[in-house]
Amino acid sequence: MNDQRKGYSRRDVLKLAAAAGAGMVLPTPLFAASGPVLSRPVPRSREMLPVVGLGTAIIFDFDSSSDTAKRAERRTVIRTLLDEGGRLIDTAPSYGRAELTLGDLLPEMGVRDRVFLATKVRATGSRDACTAEMQESLKRLRTNKLDLMQIHNVGFRDRNETTAQLDLLREWKASGVCRYIGVTHSQDQQSANDRLVDLMQREKLDFLQVNYSMAERSVEQRVLAAAADTGTAVLTNLPFARAKLFGAVRGKAVPDWAAEFDATTWGQFFLKYLLANEAVTCVIPGSDKPEYMADNLNAGRGRLPNAAMRRKMVDYITSLS
């Protein structure tokens, strides 16, 4: 197969980038379609958000005061996100030192005002405990305002508790401490999806965050449609299914027909599938290298697959398992 049509893995991208530094000419299709990263509106405000952001679980959990190598690399990841057209960074108190790392890097870089910053609060606990946790997040992030506060892994055992927590978040929103509120959920189960639909219909959420990848597609059945119907913005995490998808395609070239939607790497292939669903506001893969961050952002450029092509993509990935 001609190199200009074969597609590249992320490791290939790094190798070819090194070759470029040595003066070699790279095949043009390695690069994504030109132009700005696609943006979509937050339904309740019509604020435009770039469709690719950055998740911080595990990757930003380190001591930024002592690990200078990781600090420099993550700093470059953030710079790449912002300079290449992204905005949203998602974190949580349960992500170890991730909030502290962001609280170190964002002010130092002078980019806090360019970032759409989202964090989370526990799904259970007293009003005082939840308030204390949110206040601690502000302290760790070294900011007095957040763009999005989310109830983390919302539960369905106690409807009154969830309502009380959302009321607390609404108070924070009314006071101007956060601009949007929402919930996250990570169970890939139909029963949980049904409850999420009920929650969106009952409560006027600004955002919902769910797991969604080509390996976990249960939210396609009802959740994403309900989000669109209720005016709820959607963030999707684990878009590579914790690298399961990259494992499935290891050693394989991106199929020629991926050129029809401007995907030149597997990362773009996987993300463009998700972004083709217009209910998805922003995907938030973790990125520990600037090259990966740039590749993720390139998924938001160029064409997206249509419904028939998405079915073909699923059939192809399924055939590899």
Predicted segment positions?
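Conserved, mostly hydrophobic/aromatic
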Residues: V42, L54, I89, L102, ...
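Short, acidic/polar
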Residues: D67-T80, R127-R140, S191-D198, F270
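N-terminal export leaders
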Residues: Y8-L26
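Beta/alpha (TIM)-barrel catalytic core signal, keyed to glycine-rich beta->alpha loops juxtaposed to Asp/Glu
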Residues: V154-S321
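C-terminal segment of N-terminal export signals and the immediately downstream linker at the start
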Residues: T28-T56, D63-S66
